């Protein structure tokens, strides 16, 4: 992983075969980033993608091992159990330009992983909401 910083904005290059979520989470821990917005593009593989089933309060997961274009990565960083936690959704495209999208659990960089992280100076966190079954934003 490589990065450059300009104030509260970081340009982060996640390198080939590095796990995206693990790498970005560790970056936040190492740089004391507790709240942020993250976006990115690239080419990824070994993707664990999900969609939340609210009725059953569980994720329906799919694995994609092939190489896919990462056409959009959007996420946020908030504290969960006193640690930076990234919640991210992605859109991906295969070689026939067919797409998929959903909640990203993890993926590895296949070719490039180019991300912009903008630190936000707030005290947002995640707290468990029993009606949803997830740790949701708590901004009070």
PLM regions and their residue ranges:
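N-terminal intrinsically disordered, cationic/polar leader segments
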Residues: 1-87, 91-140
């Amino acid at each position: 992983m490589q990065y450059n910083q300009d104030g509260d904005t970081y340009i982060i290059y996640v390198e080939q075969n590095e796990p995206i979520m693990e790498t970005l989470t560790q970056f936040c821990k190492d740089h004391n980033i507790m709240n942020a917005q993250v976006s990115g593009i690239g080419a990824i593989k070994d993707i664990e993608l999900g969609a939340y089933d609210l009725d059953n309060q569980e994720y329906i997961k799919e694995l994609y091992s092939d190489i896919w274009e990462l056409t959009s990565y959007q996420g946020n960083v908030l504290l969960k159990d006193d640690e930076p936690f990234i919640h991210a959704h992605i859109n991906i495209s295969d070689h026939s330009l067919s797409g998929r999208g959903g909640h990203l659990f993890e993926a590895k960089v296949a070719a490039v992983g180019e991300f912009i992280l903008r630190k936000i100076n707030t005290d947002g966190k995640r707290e468990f909401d029993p009606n949803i079954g997830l740790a949701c934003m708590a901004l009070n």
